[in-house]
């Protein structure tokens, strides 16, 4: 594996620019509409809108929009040709002006961004309604991932080979740049998750991620299978032993000289999960390329923190393994010893994520951080209880609630879940300290959280985020969220770190 390894292919997003005035040679101007009285649309905006369009031009645009039935309803897209020496207009509805918030603006701009195939240069005044939200929506909504199809293949998505530039007219430069960094972070997480396991496996993943982090001055360290064995990382080794592509542990470190707090990030990095000896059904197993979504989120988050120069020390600990059945695979009935000495009885090899997280969380706890956040596509029970779009957040009460509330505030749905004490009896083993699953079909998400709690150091504020559903969208695109990798919950974690840094 070359030390210079990079992702074999990256997704494409629009180039976002901040301009003081309307550039020349614009293909279209994107405007926003509110729903007015009697369902008649109203142009949304003020100074920026007036800087581009005269009152006469605005009236002509509204007449055209009304003529083709535009109402200004949320996420409604309407196109009209240019009038009064104005470029063609693409209008997106925002609904009621009184009910507009950042998430509605993100979803609307994401929706319109997905509709701009075939355009090369567009300008927009929507930034004056909320620049950060608009940049996020346009950036993430414009994302496309061609994958490894050959150039010029007829199967390529329409417009994917025609780059789009979006010009925001006016706004604060610092806010614009910070929003771009967040977009870049989500895109990196999406690209990592979308990369097939043939190309992203523990060894390559560790090198690719380390190279990405090194570009922004982060300290990197990679432990191979021999070092993992020497240091006693029994969970990572057990899960990865069935594969010919051996496990790795990646450590990334960001330090700020004025920081007073230390945050540990841990992300599940199972680059492909067959279930091991407890083999998964074949249907939809291809989606298991996403089983490293938690690790991708943490890698992207710590890089964004460095780029934003956040005044907080951060260490990301990323266990990476491929869970495969073979003559060398771990088995139900095995007992493994984790980093730090706790032992686990294996009842199901498809509950592997918590085993590698346990090692990583025990190591992260040795650094005595103030906060520990882990993220993982961990349980099917998360999908059953909260669905495809809402993460389950567990942990110490106050910090758990903070992370869940922050997620909702940035538009990444999250809900605080309990860790009932009675589950402790169900994760006890007669032959080890713990068992990796219970004998009950109930409370699977909480039981996994209760298991992980055993590996969190005393006095550490902790949040465990189960993203089994939200990390990978198997349904249709919506708002600024594409099909396949979503990049959740990167924006949540960036905001949590910003809040900690500013205290």
Curated annotation (Swiss-Prot):
Q: Which residues bind Mn(2+) 1?
A: 273, 350, 352
- Where in or outside the cell is it found? Cytoplasm
Reaction catalysis annotation: Release of an N-terminal amino acid, Xaa-|-Yaa-, in which Xaa is preferably Leu, but may be other amino acids including Pro although not Arg or Lys, and Yaa may be Pro. Amino acid amides and methyl esters are also readily hydrolyzed, but rates on arylamides are exceedingly low; Release of an N-terminal amino acid, preferentially leucine, but not glutamic or aspartic acids
User: What keywords appear on the UniProt entry?
Assistant: Aminopeptidase, Cytoplasm, Hydrolase, Manganese, Metal-binding, Protease
- EC number(s)? 3.4.11.1, 3.4.11.10
Question: Which residues make up the binding site for Mn(2+) 2?
Answer: 268, 273, 291, 352
Residues annotated as catalytic: 280, 354
Drop me one GO molecular function for this one: manganese ion binding
What GO terms in the biological process aspect are recorded for it?
proteolysis
Q: How is the cofactor bound?
A: Binds 2 manganese ions per subunit.
Give, as one word, the top-level EC class: hydrolase
Q: Which SUPFAM superfamilies match?
A: Macro domain-like (SSF52949), Zn-dependent exopeptidases (SSF53187)
Predominant cellular place of this UniProt entry's protein: cytoplasm
InterPro entries hit by this protein: Leucine_aapep/pepB, Macro_dom-like, Peptidase_M17_C, Peptidase_M17_leu_NH2_pept, Peptidase_M17_N
List the PANTHER family: CYTOSOL AMINOPEPTIDASE, LEUCINE AMINOPEPTIDASE-RELATED
Output the HAMAP family linked to this UniProt entry.
Answer: Cytosol_peptidase_M17
Q: Per the similarity annotation, which family is this?
A: Belongs to the peptidase M17 family.
* Function according to Swiss-Prot or TrEMBL: Presumably involved in the processing and regular turnover of intracellular proteins. Catalyzes the removal of unsubstituted N-terminal amino acids from various peptides.
Official protein name in the record: Probable cytosol aminopeptidase
């Amino acid at each position: 594996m070359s030390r210079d390894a990079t992702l074999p292919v990256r997704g494409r997003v629009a180039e976002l620019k901040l301009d003081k005035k309307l550039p020349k040679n614009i293909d279209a101007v994107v405007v926003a509409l509110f729903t007015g009285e009697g369902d008649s649309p109203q142009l949304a905006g003020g100074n920026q809108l007036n800087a581009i369009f005269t009152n006469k031009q605005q009236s002509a645009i509204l007449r055209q929009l009304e003529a083709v039935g535009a109402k200004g309803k949320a996420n409604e897209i309407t196109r009209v040709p240019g009038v009064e020496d104005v470029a063609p207009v693409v209008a997106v509805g925002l609904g009621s002006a009184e009910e507009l918030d950042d998430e509605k603006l993100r979803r609307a701009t994401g929706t319109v961004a997905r509709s701009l195939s075939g355009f090369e240069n567009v300008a927009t005044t929507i930034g004056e309604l909320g620049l950060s939200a608009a940049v996020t929506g346009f950036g993430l909504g414009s994302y496309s991932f061609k994958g490894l199809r050959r150039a010029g293949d007829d199967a390529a998505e329409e417009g994917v080979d025609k780059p789009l530039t979006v010009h925001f007219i006016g706004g604060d430069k610092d806010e614009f740049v910070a929003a771009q960094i967040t977009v870049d972070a989500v895109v990196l997480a999406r690209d990592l998750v979308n990369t097939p396991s043939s190309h992203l496996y523990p060894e390559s993943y560790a090198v690719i991620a380390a190279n990405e982090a090194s570009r922004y001055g982060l300290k990197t360290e990679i432990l191979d299978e021999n070092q993992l064995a020497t240091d006693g990382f029994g969970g990572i080794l057990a899960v990865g032993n069935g594969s010919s592509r051996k496990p790795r542990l990646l450590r990334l470190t960001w330090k700020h000289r004025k920081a007073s707090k230390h945050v540990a990030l841990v992300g599940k990095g199972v680059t492909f999960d067959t279930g091991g000896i407890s083999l998964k059904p074949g249907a939809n197993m291809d989606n298991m390329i996403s089983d490293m979504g938690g690790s991708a989120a943490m890698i992207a988050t710590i890089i964004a923190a460095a780029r934003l120069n956040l005044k907080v020390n951060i260490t990301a600990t990323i266990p990476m393994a491929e869970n495969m059945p073979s003559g060398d695979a771990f088995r139900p009935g095995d007992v493994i010893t984790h980093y730090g000495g706790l032992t686990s009885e294996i009842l199901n090899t498809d509950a592997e994520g918590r085993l590698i997280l346990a090692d990583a969380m025990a190591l992260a706890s040795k650094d005595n951080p103030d906060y520990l956040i882990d993220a993982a596509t961990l349980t099917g029970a998360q999908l059953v209880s909260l669905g495809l779009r809402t993460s389950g957040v567990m942990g110490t009460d106050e910090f758990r609630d903070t992370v869940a509330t922050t997620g909702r505030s940035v538009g990444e749905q999250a809900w605080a879940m309990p860790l009932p004490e009675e589950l402790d009896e169900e994760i006890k083993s007669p032959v080890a300290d713990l068992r990796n699953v219970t004998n009950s079909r109930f409370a699977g998400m909480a039981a996994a959280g209760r298991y992980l709690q055993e590996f969190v150091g005393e006095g550490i504020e902790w949040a465990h985020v189960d993203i089994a559903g939200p990390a990978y969208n198997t349904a249709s695109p919506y708002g600024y969220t594409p099909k396949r990798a979503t990049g959740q919950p990167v924006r949540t974690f960036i905001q949590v770190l910003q809040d900690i840094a500013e205290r």
